[in-house]
Design a protein with these regions (language model features):
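A non-catalytic structural micro-motif
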Residues: 194-196
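A polyanion-binding, active-site-adjacent surface
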Residues: 2, 14-162, 166-169, 174, ...
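Short, contiguous pre-domain boundary segments
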Residues: 5-8
Length: 222
């Protein structure tokens, strides 16, 4: 049985006991024993470990983990300190500077966001090395859709930040009118100029949180 170490254990108890997760677990046992996969098995649930269910103020949905060595550590868009900052995250930092005047960090670790209540959740939590989307059909999508549905049930407001078509497809699960959805193009260099730049997701998140009487996020990462 997986142990997250906070209220997610109770919230997701049925999911972790269910047939879908058992299928995921068997798939991962085989994948991790025969191939290089990311993140480390110990980091798969870091998004949930760092951000308790009842502490979630905002959700930034990613697609699947970075698939090169040393990058993925269980938080969407984030890399460990000392690892080169990927292009999508460089663009996130550019928008953060444009939006709130926060200079780009010298590292790509977003742990500070996670510890303040920003759930950095990928819709697929693992990947085989060098093969983007290689685990997309193993059951993770259903598992993380269930997480979004659980968050939708919360009676305190959450900001859902959906970048790109994959993330925006999850909007169907956000039906509770107390929540706030921010949508735009993905920060990837392929699409950032199609509506990500200039979308001001960070200030808009904080404006909404303050209007709901919730402490805003300090978006600095260092």
């Amino acid at each position: 049985m997986v142990r997250i170490g906070n209220s997610w254990d109770e919230i997701l108890a049925d999911e972790f006991r269910g047939e879908n997760y058992l299928k995921i677990r068997e798939f991962l046992k085989d994948e991790y024993s025969h191939h290089v996969c990311y993140p480390s098995m110990y980091d798969i649930f870091n998004a949930l470990k760092y951000t308790d269910y009842y502490d979630v103020k905002a959700v930034i949905l990613g697609q699947d983990p970075y698939h090169e060595e040393g990058q993925a550590h269980g938080l969407s868009f984030s890399v460990k300190k000392g690892v080169e900052i990927p292009p999508s995250l460089q663009n996130i930092y550019k928008e953060l500077q444009s939006d709130l005047g926060i200079p780009p960090a010298k590292h790509g670790c977003l742990e500070n966001w996670a510890r303040q209540g920003v759930l950095l959740l990928n819709s697929v939590l693992t990947v085989r090395a060098h093969l983007a989307n290689s685990h997309k059909n193993c059951g993770w999508q259903q598992f993380t859709d269930d997480i979004i549905k659980k968050l939708n049930e919360r009676d305190t407001p959450i900001v859902f930040i959906l970048w790109g078509a994959n993330a925006r497809s999850k909007k169907q699960y956000i039906t509770n009118p107390i929540h706030y959805v921010i949508e735009s193009a993905h920060p990837s260099p392929l699409s950032a100029y199609n509506g990500f730049f200039g979308s001001r997701p960070f200030s808009r998140t904080n404006e909404f949180l303050k209007s709901a009487g919730i402490e805003p996020v300090d978006w600095r990462t260092e």
